[in-house]
């Protein structure tokens, strides 16, 4: 493979938007309609952080068709992202564990067929890893189509060289950049537009359906068994890294403050250990509900009906941000600048809805509570 062209973030030499003085050659052959493939496979938080790039593309390229390749576990979330046409699920994590199994070979062939069913004018690798480079390389491009990727690593993010080897054009980004802005800037460089305005995620939850859990002993309003009689705040304590956790005693103190202030507490979990923690917290509270195990789709839809979310740096907390919920994100490390809620523009004259709290070894319950009280007043569950 030849070394790709490397550009700084800015107008790319590849596919261009059909307006604003840009080169329309690549899109003219398609009647002004561009087909874009986003490659962002995992993890949960990273997938959420890529969603605003889709909304930018829709705003800048009317009529654009956007497909997205993602790990199957996160596909239910991407299907709720406005503007995504086809979600192409893969299971690279599982396939790598059993590469020669008959089931793996069958599923791999089916995945390749789905991936190559359409030709794309732009294949954009937003992941920057070998596995995403492989997917981008396998994707089919149109006659004038090109593959794009990051030319360099950004602070705190994984990056592997094959992503730039596979790309027709690798785009250099500033190393100190928020995860949301990184994806937005890369897509903007591909099509020659500027990133403006706050990030819009376009995450639209589904309606509460019959499979969404009902709290025992609560009939709710209007026949909807989930709807709370008072505002409910979800606490997200689970995380894949032990050093991101918050002490159990701190969760209990926070939950007691919420109960005393008139909030009900909901506790999410994804593993047996997290469920045990949820039950331990709930046992110390007057009004708490440990949610049953749910798929990502039901969990997203259920969380959307809460008055707010307080959680550690985890995928569920990032979903809360994308849903636009009042949210406090807890950090034991000074990395909120990279993955936490983006700061509100002081000139926008808007009430603050989402903040992060950082301290070492961890923020105190008082600091988190003060952050919660500083937010715009939570509304009752819908």
Which residues does each predicted region cover?
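Catalytic machinery of carbohydrate-active enzymes
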Residues: 1-382
């Amino acid at each position: 493979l030849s070394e790709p062209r490397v550009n700084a973030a800015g107008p790319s030499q590849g596919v261009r938007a059909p307006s604003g003085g840009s080169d329309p050659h690549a899109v003219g052959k398609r009647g002004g309609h561009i087909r874009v493939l986003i490659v962002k496979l995992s993890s949960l938080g990273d997938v959420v952080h890529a969603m605003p790039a889709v909304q930018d593309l829709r705003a800048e390229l009317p009529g654009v068709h956007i497909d997205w390749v993602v790990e199957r576990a996160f596909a239910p979330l991407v299907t709720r992202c406005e503007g995504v046409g086809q979600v192409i699920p893969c299971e690279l994590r599982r396939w790598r564990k059993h590469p020669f199994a008959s089931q793996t070979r069958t599923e791999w062939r089916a995945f390749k067929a789905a991936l190559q069913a359409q030709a794309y004018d732009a294949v954009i690798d937003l992941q920057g890893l070998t596995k995403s480079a492989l997917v981008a390389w396998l994707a089919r491009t149109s006659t004038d189509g090109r593959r794009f990727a990051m030319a360099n690593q950004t602070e705190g993010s994984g990056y592997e060289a094959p992503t730039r080897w596979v790309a027709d054009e690798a785009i250099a980004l500033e190393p100190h950049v928020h995860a949301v802005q990184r994806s937005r800037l890369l897509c903007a460089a591909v099509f020659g537009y500027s990133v403006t305005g706050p990030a819009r995620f376009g995450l639209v939850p589904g309606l509460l359906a019959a499979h969404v859990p009902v709290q025992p002993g609560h009939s709710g309003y209007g026949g909807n068994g989930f709807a709370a009689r008072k505002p409910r705040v979800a606490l997200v304590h689970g995380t894949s890294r032990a050093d991101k956790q918050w002490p159990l005693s701190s969760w209990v103190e926070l939950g007691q403050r919420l109960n005393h202030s008139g909030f009900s507490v909901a506790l999410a979990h994804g593993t047996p250990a997290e469920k045990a923690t949820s039950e331990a917290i709930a046992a110390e509270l007057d009004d708490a509900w440990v949610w049953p195990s749910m798929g990502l789709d039901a969990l997203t839809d259920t969380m959307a009906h809460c008055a707010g979310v307080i959680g550690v740096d985890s995928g569920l907390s990032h979903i809360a941000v994308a849903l636009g919920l009042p949210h406090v994100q807890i950090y034991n490390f000074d990395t909120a600048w990279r993955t936490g809620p983006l700061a509100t523009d002081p000139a926008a004259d808007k009430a603050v809805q989402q903040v992060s709290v950082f301290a070492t070894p961890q923020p105190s319950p008082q600091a988190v509570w003060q952050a919660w009280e500083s937010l715009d007043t939570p509304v009752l569950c819908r």
